[in-house]
């Protein structure tokens, strides 16, 4: 395939997947915490010496962010939880570890089928889950209990926790293990996000938002090495 045709394929696919998203929601999500973490993941890859991988994901940045947006819409958000103590998710829904593995495998298969933009779209969905499990409420399967308040607080202050090097690359060759590992750390910080304390929010976020950026870099490199 020529470079021109490849770029046209990428553009057409991402337009298809984002066309049905409400404009306000699309602006909010693409400018939000997940897109910020994706961007920092690319920067971490670059600064850690994985420049080819970083440039690859820069080329596919919009597709990755489109997948991040899509998985937060509708009932798909019910699968964003994983309790590391029980190995379960929210109620009868598949847990985040299962869904992450499914999306990662789908992304690999699509890439091998030359459906590149669609592949990175589903990788974005998998990466979103890795990031979500750095939030204590997702690791405790809690929809309430200050969940929205904490995420809103962290969203407004995300630039204070910006990382640009030192990615985590050695968790596992299995996508689901990245969910489990992040969930273990996040749940340890649950007590800090229960009481709306700014000081406690800071203590939790200082550990967890950098973790989301570091593991995003590692998770993206895992996929890059597979293709």
Residue ranges and their predicted role:
Residues 1-113, 121, 139-226:
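N-terminal, motif-rich segments that launch catalysis or mediate targeting to/interaction with membranes
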Residues 118-140:
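Active-site alpha-helical segments that house and flank conserved acidic catalytic motifs
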């Amino acid at each position: 395939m020529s470079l021109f045709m490849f770029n046209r394929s990428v553009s057409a696919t991402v337009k298809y997947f984002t066309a049905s998203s409400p404009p306000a929601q699309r602006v909010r999500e693409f400018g939000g915490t997940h897109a910020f973490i994706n961007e920092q993941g690319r920067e971490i890859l670059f600064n850690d010496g994985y420049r080819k991988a970083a440039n690859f994901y820069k080329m596919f940045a919009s597709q990755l962010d489109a997948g991040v947006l899509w998985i937060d819409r509708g009932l798909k958000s019910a699968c964003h939880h994983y309790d590391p103590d029980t190995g379960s998710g929210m109620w009868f829904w598949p847990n985040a570890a299962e869904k992450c593995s499914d999306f990662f495998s789908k992304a690999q298969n699509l890439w091998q089928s030359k459906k590149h933009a669609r592949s990175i779209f589903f990788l974005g969905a998998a990466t979103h889950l890795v990031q979500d499990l750095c939030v204590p409420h997702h690791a405790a399967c809690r929809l309430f209990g200050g969940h929205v308040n904490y995420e809103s607080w962290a969203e407004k202050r995300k630039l204070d926790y910006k990382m640009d090097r030192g990615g985590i690359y050695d968790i596992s060759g299995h996508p689901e293990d990245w969910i489990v590992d992040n969930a273990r750390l996040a749940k340890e910080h649950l007590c800090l996000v229960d009481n709306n304390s700014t000081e406690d929010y800071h203590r939790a976020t200082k550990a967890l938002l950098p973790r989301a950026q570091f593991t995003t870099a590692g998770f993206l490199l895992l996929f890059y090495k597979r293709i």
